[in-house]
Amino acid sequence: MALPIIIDCDPGHDDAIALVLALASPELEVKAITSSAGNQTPEKTLRNVLRMLTLLKRPDIPVAGGAVKPLMRELIIADNVHGESGLNGPALPEPSFAPQSGTAVELMAKTLRESAQPVTIVSTGPQTNVALLLNSHPELHTKIARIVIMGGAMALGNWTPAAEFNIYVDPEAAEIVFQSGIPVVMAGLDVTHKAQIHAADIERFRAIGNPISTIVAELLDFFMEYHKDEKWGFVGAPLHDPCTIAWLLKPEIFTTVERWVGVETKGKYTQGMTVVDYYFLTGNKPNATVMVDVDRQGFVDLLAERLQYYA
């Protein structure tokens, strides 16, 4: 039986590729997609979900827009990474269908209520929508199998020296998610910076030759430019968000540890930092499965294999 999932995302190049991977995988049943504000403004990320589903010919999947700003802060966006549209690079279609009239939280709650089995929530943007769901519907916590997030880092940040972007945008929301008691799987920068796509991998995807693999290659062409900055020391571009979907499909290509994670919401220098109790110093019981390594070639091979689905 396919694993039921809800995807909450803020497309964003890597979010878009995570959608491509999920919808090419019969092991997963994508029951709903909600948009969050993060990589771009809420209007643009919602539009980008609709554009991607139009491209992938999946107007059957319910879509709803989420919160327009973080729980307690003003919105920060990453237009320097993802461009003015949030998906700069390829020519994507205009949406062929409209989102549902309700909110992301309403769609998530409805999906959980109606599911015969617990649902996995995959969150590849700030945690605002998921935190609002958890706070407003405590009766539905048992309907959530786990929450798989792209966010955080044990070591170095990518938006501040201490903080990864998704967590930094809404640290209060992330803290709610980590302390919810629901199993959390964290794909942080420690693993996603190892899931780099090299120039040769992009050409491999392009050579598959179907319309979707071509679009993915063009998304990566644009995404690669930001990551060529020497300060990162990257060979390619880290493909953050697809690590969440890849873990669901092939957990064996990832190395994980069970640890307690908290989010710093007030630090002068460390606001938005995910504090991972790696050496069990706090006495707190682990609340997260933390990805720490990935078989990069296995990750690339999985993407290439699933892009064949669109032939």
UniProtKB/Swiss-Prot annotation:
InterPro entries, A to Z: I/U_nuclsd_hydro_CS (IPR015910), Inosine/uridine_hydrolase_dom (IPR001910), IUNH (IPR023186), Pyrim_hydro_RihA (IPR022975), Ribo_hydro-like (IPR036452)
Disulfide bonds: none
MF terms in GO: purine nucleosidase activity; uridine nucleosidase activity
Gene Ontology cellular component annotations, sorted alphabetically: cytosol
Active site feature: 240
EC number per UniProt: 3.2.-.-
Keyword field contains Cell division: no
Keyword vocabulary terms for this entry: Glycosidase, Hydrolase
Gene3D superfamilies xrefs: Ribonucleoside hydrolase-like
Region forming the signal peptide: none
GO biological process, one term: pyrimidine nucleobase metabolic process
Known role: Hydrolyzes cytidine or uridine to ribose and cytosine or uracil, respectively.
UniProt similarity note: Belongs to the IUNH family. RihA subfamily.
Protein's recorded name: Pyrimidine-specific ribonucleoside hydrolase RihA
